[in-house]
Amino acid sequence: MAMADQRNDKPGRPAAQRERRGWLSRIAPGVRNFAKRETPENLWVKCPETGEMIYRPDLEAALWVTPSGHHMRIGASQRLAVTFDDGQFEKIDCPQVVEDPHKFPDDRAYPDRLKAARKQTGEQDSIAAAYGHIRGQPAVVMVQDFAFMGGSLGMGAGEAFIAAAKEAVKRQVPLVIFTASGGARMQEGTLSLMQMARTTLALNEVKDAGLPYVVVLTDPTTGGVLASYAMLGDVHLAEPNATIGFSGRRVIEQTIRETLPPGFQKSEFLVERGMIDQVVRRADLPEVLGSVLKTLMMGRERLSPAA
């Protein structure tokens, strides 16, 4: 009987254990799910310059400038929000263009690359344009997004540039661009190279209207973009340590078979040699831009009666 009682006791213990396990199993998934919701995967960002891990909200509050002073690349929407007063602006609609006119052969179809870039950036092409106020001064601002296929210049970006230039002339306000590009978009061939000439002609209309055109060079500004509208401004500003040049450093060194000086093609190097006017920290850009634009527009108002 004693042995029988012991056998009868055994089923009771697993039942209690099952009850305890059931209680834990009910709360454990909730705790795990709560932890997942409260801890984003990209909570920490590594500084490209020093390797320091930076708390993402702190980096966003610092306008994506690391404690070491490194200016990280930011998207078009972020740039527009930071530049315009109170982050308020009106987006400028851009005409649609034919996609993949050359049926460019690649390991990944060009339309698929465009689709992925649009999903990543939320922009239609590498240039976004908007109208708003910078320290009270009305202006049309364009931003090149390097995350959109390296900020490459294609037909869509060219149309966006022209639409922005026309809007500036229509509203009689200054035109500003933040450049960031690797150059012309190879998938569009000669149609991409045509945009260098088309954007230059659009700028002629802005200048014929007596309106200022200010360029802010950000990292990196290279290739056909530098050879066209990036160097046609009335005033050229640049962010710190931005790479600015037509060809890459290694390409130049291999071509001329010489070692280039330290800091070559960096904004600080270029301002010392008179190629750009001023290097400005990102946090100070709205104030500096507002001051420059107001000064240039005051000069235009003084000249307009004589004209």
UniProtKB/Swiss-Prot annotation:
Signal peptide: none
PROSITE patterns: COA_CT_NTER (PS50980)
Name of protein: Acetyl-coenzyme A carboxylase carboxyl transferase subunit beta
Pathway it works in: Lipid metabolism; malonyl-CoA biosynthesis; malonyl-CoA from acetyl-CoA: step 1/1
GO BP, one annotated term: malonyl-CoA biosynthetic process
Enzyme class: transferase
Domain CoA carboxyltransferase N-terminal, residue spans: 43-307
Major localisation: cytoplasm
Localization, UniProt: Cytoplasm
Source organism, top-level taxon: Bacteria
Alphabetic keyword roster: ATP-binding, Cytoplasm, Fatty acid biosynthesis, Fatty acid metabolism, Lipid biosynthesis, Lipid metabolism, Nucleotide-binding, Transferase
Catalytic activity field: N(6)-carboxybiotinyl-L-lysyl-[protein] + acetyl-CoA = N(6)-biotinyl-L-lysyl-[protein] + malonyl-CoA
Disordered as annotated region, ranges: 1-21
SUPFAM superfamilies: ClpP/crotonase
